[in-house]
Amino acid sequence: GLGDVYKRQVLFSALSLHSCTLEEYNPGAFTKEALATSIDGYETLINQCYFAMERFYYGSADWMSLTEGDTDLWTYKANESTSYTQWFWFFAGTSPNTTYTNNWWNGTYDGVGACNEAIALGDKPPYTTEEERNAKIAEARFLRAVYYFNAVEQFGAVTMLTEPITAETLTYSPTRTDPMTIYQEVILPDLRFASEWLPTGTHATTTTPTKKAALGFLAKACLQTYEYGSTEYLQEALDA
């Protein structure tokens, strides 16, 4: 009767709500640790460090128009005017909104995370010399310094992450670290390492950092610490 049908439905619903465990299996056995055990695989991880830099920083008009628009950093070849002239010169004709900064913020920490992964796994690939290994790690450390430099200079205290996130370290209530601490513990050490190990490069080297780029950025970062009340690094800026 209807009573039996109702009882069966209640029993089925109760059984459906019963908790169960799920044992996951990765048939491909793909992990970043495994990827990093070959040189090609590790350099794929290095390439990922550049993604947010191209997508949200210097390969996109949004971030540069907010931070560098209406300055003398932008012009056009032979002063040729285009539809973007007023955009870059006066930020006119744009429709700025919070999407600009939201995308940039997420991209920044995507880049930081990629750099942290590459740095942490730097001992895995079978490079023949430590010079080769450190040159690649130096790319990731240079980029991490650039990400944090921009984050600190635009937003002040931000969350400082220097290790890959794991299930144990994941938090939904991150804390902020003051700018000077980030300079001392991340930006300056990363740029010193990059200055030591990045290759000199040639005039054709335009898409990857070189020793000259690292030295220039190190000097800039050292000078910027003066804004936070420190004179400790001014001589290092002159020597870089």
Per-region residue spans from a language model:
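Short, small-residue-biased leader/transition segments that mark boundaries at the very start
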Residues: 1-6
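Bacterial N-terminal signal peptides
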Residues: 7-16
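Membrane-proximal, proline-rich intrinsically disordered regions
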Residues: 19-67, 238
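Short, well-structured active-site flanking segments
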Residues: 23-25, 152-164, 234-235
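Conserved, well-structured interaction surfaces
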Residues: 39, 43, 51-52, 57, ...
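Short coil/turn linking the two alpha-helices of tandem helical-hairpin repeats
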Residues: 152-153, 159, 202, 224-230
